[in-house]
Amino acid sequence: MSAADKVKPAASPASEDPSAIAGNISYHAQYSPHFSPLAFGPEQAFYATAESVRDHLLQRWNDTYLHFHKTDPKQTYYLSMEYLQGRALTNAVGNLAITGAYADALKKFGYELEAIAGQERDAALGNGGLGRLASCFLDSMATLNLPSWGYGLRYRYGLFKQRIAKEGQEEIAEDWLDKFSPWEIVRHDVVYPIRFFGHVEISPDGKRKWAGGEVLNALAYDVPIPGYKTKNAISLRLWDATATAEDFNLFQFNDGQYESAAQLHSRAQQICAVLYPGDATEEGKLLRLKQQYFLCSASLQDIIFRFKERKADRVSGKWSEFPSKVAVQMNDTHPTLAIPELMRLLMDVEGLGWDEAWAVTNKTVAYTNHTVLPEALEKWSQAVMKKLLPRHMEIIEEIDKRFREMVISTRKDMEGKIESMRVLDNNPEKPVVRMANLCVVAGHTVNGVAELHSNILKQELFADYVSIWPNKFQNKTNGITPRRWLRFCNPELSEIVTKWLKTDQWTSNLDLLTGLRKFADDEKLHAEWAAAKLASKKRLAKHVLDVTGVTIDPDSLFDIQIKRIHEYKRQLMNILGAVYRYKKLKEMSAADRQKVTPRTVMVGGKAFATYTNAKRIVKLVNDVGAVVNNDADVNKYLKVVFIPNYNVSVAEVLIPGSELSQHISTAGMEASGTSNMKFSLNGCVIIGTLDGANVEIREEVGQDNFFLFGAKADQVAGLRKDRENGLFKPDPRFEEAKQFIRSGAFGTYDYTPLLDSLEGNTGFGRGDYFLVGYDFPSYIDAQARVDEAYKDKKKWVKMSILNTAGSGKFSSDRTIDQYAKEIWGISACPVP
Ligand code: 475
């Protein structure tokens, strides 16, 4: 049956009346010609509903654009190669406060809103924490009415879909645009030329200019981002690469040379084909650099266009005004090319001199660091850079030269440090540009993402710069949006919170959650809290059954670790712990087993396609699960499940249903973590190390409500040295767990290389670099404390309540408010 058979179509702008909304949905089903008008299945219902909601968004988005144009406030532009948006429908109707109206409207067609929302594909234009942080930030920027936009790339295929096969993880292209995205608006009026390769021309008056090479176009797609209960909607502008008709060689085509006729078109397609193309080859590296430049150049041309558009007289200059109207935030070093690109546009296109251009650039750009892992600090080959971006390389060389001169002339005492602080590393074997150094030298502010991480930046990674620019360095502890990560993903718990706080204002003022503390021992609250958790656990159990076929018991302790698979995050320690638990259960008498706290250990996450040890870890979790879950002696007390294809919408099911969550990285290595905040907010207790934001979470929720173990960050270097010097004595339990795997208890796959990475000096020559062996005994002891605590239901529910109550600090509204005041210098600009 078609939508029109059920509800009369109406083009009227959507209102908040369910009948009018139903008419509007029916209208979109009929007149947005994506599907046959005869059928109205759940998929069609999703697209028609989304288009109807988009009408609301567009109204706000247009109003906001005009309001910003008229009032001309200072505006922030967030440059990020990644956004992990996930699904948008539930969030959009929630933020617009029209969830009930849309739920009622859909009932007229016989549909539940939740089921229709489940039809949407995740927009996974990011890898992990950094990308999801960018998405939480957009939600907070809109909610706080801040004049700010995000810029990114419109990848054709997002983060790969993960399938678990016999050999382990398989990657499949994630086709989020398979049909189309109802949320994006293609902007044929917003197009900028982007040049690659070519050469630098010098005119008779000595002016330098980039010319030649090939020129593609950047075409804008706008995704409106609604704030929570505000009229403001901001923009996430995603760039796609295109070539023009002029680039199509009709002569060659008619001559049968089809491929060479459309060469530039196919090169344009490559730019935004995939998120993070493999960079093991030179081609892969070049493509990644092209992507980065494409984002930076298109965004800066657009920013300059808008700067001029908002006041007619800016066409003729007033560049010193630019930093009072524009703030550019670089999300890690991936958009570092914004620095030389802004310099180039100001000097070569707008005609400024170096000093003037440098002053403007320096006052405009700021840099957030998200990692201290040496292998994750970007370095680009000078040769590749020279070939692809010859004019930018000149500018970078000049920045490097001037920085050296400045240090030599003003800081004699720092001379010995210059080589490591320089932007260029001229090591003859492999000359590179150090992108983080460029960001520190050129930006006005550098920030880390949690207290501990920011201190490590100041004391270690960037210590030398601190002595030159003591005021450049800041901390901005990460946050998460309480809308998506409690209000919308956990409606049961949200209702309880609202009921006990007697207000739902916590949704945009998360500090109000502390008001729950005074009810932490209230038996009525305990009963409601436990019932909500059980409902979420059942939903989680259904998801697990659907995607893995494994039945798990909602009365067991749900213990979850979900995040990218990485050795520093130590999923391997988790699974060794599960193996040890399994072995002890096997050795126990049946009577003793009955005293054990039943547990379901769940692990989820994607391994980078070429990261061999991470893929081995995925395989090991699956292999351990296959044995344990089918062992009738013990599977009442332990299940081990690998959750495939972890993504934002899976997180929205898993986090509310978890009770214990693992954040167990080697201290000093996880810059912040943000899922730790989501778990804690949803009343889940953390077992973790003193790393990243765990430190601050533990402070906020109280040390009794956090299971702490492991070495501290300042011990790690010494422990590694001891280990190298043969001073490490492994705990017998650690040896036992490894030996059990080596014995073949979990199948015939060869885990030797993985386990060897935990031994002496064999792990890539750095022997258990992540200190699994050192932390294992205290981890096992902490897990034993968890088992005991869980037996006391009252105690556990209280810990759970106090975790939620102590999570107020971790709202991204707080984080963004601090960025706005302390880095960007922008203020709210609400649409009247
Ligand atoms: C940290 N991703 C978390 C989170 O601040 C932190 C790196 C290279 C290329 C592509 N993506 C990346 C990251 O570095 C990343 O996700 N970093 C994470 O940023 C937000 O909470 O501790 O590991």
From Swiss-Prot:
List of residues that carry N6-(pyridoxal phosphate)lysine: 678
UniProt xrefs under InterPro entries: Glycg_phsphrylas, Glyco_trans_35, Pyridoxal_P_attach_site
Keyword Cytoplasm tagged: yes
Annotated SUPFAM superfamilies: UDP-Glycosyltransferase/glycogen phosphorylase (SSF53756)
Catalytic activity: [(1->4)-alpha-D-glucosyl](n) + phosphate = [(1->4)-alpha-D-glucosyl](n-1) + alpha-D-glucose 1-phosphate
Subcellular location per the Swiss-Prot or TrEMBL entry: Cytoplasm
PROSITE patterns tied to this protein: PHOSPHORYLASE
GO biological process: glycogen catabolic process
One Gene Ontology cellular component: cytoplasm
Pfam families tied to this protein: Phosphorylase (PF00343)
Cofactors, names only: pyridoxal 5'-phosphate
Keywords per UniProt: Allosteric enzyme, Carbohydrate metabolism, Cytoplasm, Glycosyltransferase, Pyridoxal phosphate, Transferase
Enzyme Commission numbers on file: 2.4.1.1
GO MF, one example: glycogen phosphorylase activity
Top-level class of the enzyme under EC nomenclature: transferase
General function of this protein: Phosphorylase is an important allosteric enzyme in carbohydrate metabolism. Enzymes from different sources differ in their regulatory mechanisms and in their natural substrates. However, all known phosphorylases share catalytic and structural properties.
Stated family: Belongs to the glycogen phosphorylase family.
Name of the protein described by the UniProt record: Alpha-glucan phosphorylase, H isozyme
